[in-house]
């Protein structure tokens, strides 16, 4: 008689326990155990419980290959969900096999778990295990299906595919309700307390292993509803017309002010702070160093001489590498939209900036169109106060549009959704890259589904607050993806290509490069452990299918993007995986977390403009300035969005935090510990530096970075 001792851990989440019958079957190289029910006195499998059981066999089973978990009806109780974290099996000789699960098991089904040792397909030779990999991926591909949102967009998850699966196909796929079509607007309606329509059906059905936890859902609602109702009760969400004075805008979120929001309110109109935001604001990726002026921006030395001073000139500063350009060309053909029944306007500015000898980045000249001429004056710091402020505000509006649509939603949310989908569809649970990437895909499918149901849907928040509306968003993102490259995606390459490696006080760059290096070192150790040679990379058919699917579905097979369609060496793997993890975590934090801080003072990030860009100088006053900014209700709706996306709901997992132990071998566990140690040192360095800054830069402090795109 051989006795196997099982230790079963149920997740600590709300409603994670089950009343259903749980049985197991152990499968080894020498046979399999009888199916045995796990039952003790009292309740089994309560949330957070760790319980021990024995499985008796007539003989030892050899090396354990699979553990089958059977979930079946118990008496008259309704079927429920069970979150199984892991099962540890102590064999008769005292050795321990770990079977990670970390998934919701719904309904009545059988789930097959493999030991936690990560294995590529090249390392599996037994037909039983090869068949298991094939069946697992086939089931996942039936559950997680691709869907086209709009031409030129990265493909997304089709929530229609979360349907009842046959019990013998349930590996991690346990949704039991058929979904309504995501594009069907029949459920697109207003809810009390929310200023926009919400596509309710698309929110109701989400595969349980990718949806928000109850804790996160409740936290999100508690962030959203009071803020929205508070503005509603004060009449702000319904008040149309211009703001009467600038100071009135401070009352929108009077109870949600931060140190940074106060700093922005005090310094927003200063040229130094305008330039600072290109380095450490929410869109720190726009600047390019230039050695000559583009023909479409005919700035002369005489125009900028008063700012440059007598000791230098424009040509000299160009040659020294001190002149930078922010070019919003992508907005030139963007369609515009009506808000409150009034036409809105968009500019496509060119903003020239200078790095002064004092190390400050300041604007030199602003042209509000891509076509120079008499109707497109070049605005200068020497112009009247209101002319210059209005020109800068137009640039800030362009910053808002490019940041929200491309830098933020396209390049983090949508691309990371494609990475998550390819990982779920092409890599089995036992694959080392699945184990590496899974924590960095947590909740991404859910948050993007929420975004499409509340922001991108017809009459959603994008239609309610932006000058380009939903159709303009589609144009911007499709155009942005068509020009997005692998160089843009990889932080060190992007900084080098933009010529911004030497700018002082560029905290996004400095912190980002440290985090990139820490991720790269971690990934290099993991890849080196599982992929010792070029051949081991090239022969991994699952890895190549994963890479090819990302290339086809995220980047639409565009060769000019420079993204890999297959991986040939461990070095190529390390770079690609490092970039994915960085963009799913640190890059998203950098472009998301500060939105309320920098946008709560509305003139610093207006979502729309009600007057066309000025064609002459000398006509702007305070009144015309206020009449150009968004109306009161538009401003409040947009600031509500800023507030929500900047408040990470509960159930957070900071970068490098891996409570789900998918890796069970000692080598990757040591690599994880080393990664966490590096991140802790980076955090200490950032906090020490911030003590000497007038405005601390905290968005890339590792404890404040979420592992994944989850809000």
UniProtKB/Swiss-Prot annotation:
This is Hydroperoxide isomerase ALOXE3. The lineage of its organism: Eukaryota, Metazoa, Chordata, Craniata, Vertebrata. One of its GO terms (molecular function) is iron ion binding. Residues 2-119 form the PLAT domain. Changing residue 237 to M: In ARCI3; no effect on enzyme activity. InterPro entries: LipOase (IPR000907), LipOase_C (IPR013819), LipOase_C_sf (IPR036226), LipOase_CS (IPR020834), LipOase_Fe_BS (IPR020833), LipOase_mml (IPR001885), PLAT/LH2_dom (IPR001024), PLAT/LH2_dom_sf (IPR036392). It is linked to Ichthyosis, congenital, autosomal recessive 3: A form of autosomal recessive congenital ichthyosis, a disorder of keratinization with abnormal differentiation and desquamation of the epidermis, resulting in abnormal skin scaling over the whole body. The main skin phenotypes are lamellar ichthyosis (LI) and non-bullous congenital ichthyosiform erythroderma (NCIE), although phenotypic overlap within the same patient or among patients from the same family can occur. Disulfide bonds: none annotated. Pfam families: Lipoxygenase, PLAT. Its EC number is 4.2.1.152, 5.4.4.7. Belongs to the lipoxygenase family. GO terms for biological process: arachidonate metabolic process; ceramide biosynthetic process; establishment of skin barrier; fat cell differentiation; hepoxilin biosynthetic process; linoleic acid metabolic process; lipid oxidation; lipoxygenase pathway. The gene is ALOXE3. It comes from Homo sapiens (Human). Non-heme iron-containing lipoxygenase which is atypical in that it displays a prominent hydroperoxide isomerase activity and a reduced lipoxygenases activity. The hydroperoxide isomerase activity catalyzes the isomerization of hydroperoxides, derived from arachidonic and linoleic acid by ALOX12B, into hepoxilin-type epoxyalcohols and ketones. In presence of oxygen, oxygenates polyunsaturated fatty acids, including arachidonic acid, to produce fatty acid hydroperoxides. Its cofactor is Fe cation. It is found in: Cytoplasm.
